Amino acid sequence: MEGRRLSQLDRVIINFDDALRTVFGQPRTTERASPASGIAEGALSEKERRLSGCLMRVNHAGEVAAQALYQGQALTARLTEIRKAMENAAREENEHLVWCQQRVQELGAHTSYLGPFWYGGSFVIGALAGMAGDKWSLGFVAETEHQVVKHIERHLDRISAQDAPSRAILEQMKEDEARHATVALEAGGVELPSSIKALMGAASKVMTRTAYWI
């Protein structure tokens, strides 16, 4: 579809394809190499390995949700440059998704069985945020990323120092998420009301606690 302006229907179809790729197939990425490439894993106990698997499953579920949030916002964004920024961020989130999926498998764990639910719910939230206006949509991105950074920091505190591959992935994700937040604010994002922040935090806890086990 290069060379012509995409219609809203085109974007809906592309979003549907991205949803299928994210939840069931191979998502679109910029093909950046995993930070864990070439990093040796230390001697993990069975307990440490199980904990890492559960936490990386949570991170994978979070990236499924992040991908959906960005795609939902891109679909309803009013300004073309905002839409493109959301789509580019979604590609980078997909890199995180692939990295986490690979690491989950290496740890002998499985990704969340509720992936379609995480994607669908987050896509709707993202679309609604986009409909509220670009400044609020960008503010939503910034707050989401701030919360994700804190969440990653908590995981880094729990994952064994012997699990160098998982830690390398999380450190890079933390850096990327912090940058997304800064870019969103610099592009005109506004700070969200404390009540919205609290609601976002509560929803995040439900997802992380559920994905830890399922």
Curated annotation (Swiss-Prot):
Protein's cellular compartments: Cell membrane
Chain sites annotated for binding Fe cation 1: E63, E93, H96, E177
Cofactor binding: number and manner: Binds 2 iron ions per subunit.
Gene3D superfamilies registered for this protein in UniProt: 1.20.1260.10
Pathway info: Cofactor biosynthesis; ubiquinone biosynthesis
One GO term of the biological process aspect: ubiquinone biosynthetic process
Key word Membrane present: yes
Record's bilayer topology term: Peripheral membrane protein
Enzymatic reactions: a 5-methoxy-2-methyl-3-(all-trans-polyprenyl)benzene-1,4-diol + AH2 + O2 = a 3-demethylubiquinol + A + H2O
Residues at which Fe cation 2 binds: E93, E145, E177, H180
Metal-binding found in the keyword field: yes
Cofactors: Fe cation
NCBIfam families, per database record: DMQ_monoox_COQ7
PANTHER family referenced in this protein's UniProt entry, alphabetically: 5-DEMETHOXYUBIQUINONE HYDROXYLASE, MITOCHONDRIAL, COENZYME Q10 BIOSYNTHESIS PROTEIN 7
Protein family per UniProt: Belongs to the COQ7 family.
Protein known as: 3-demethoxyubiquinol 3-hydroxylase
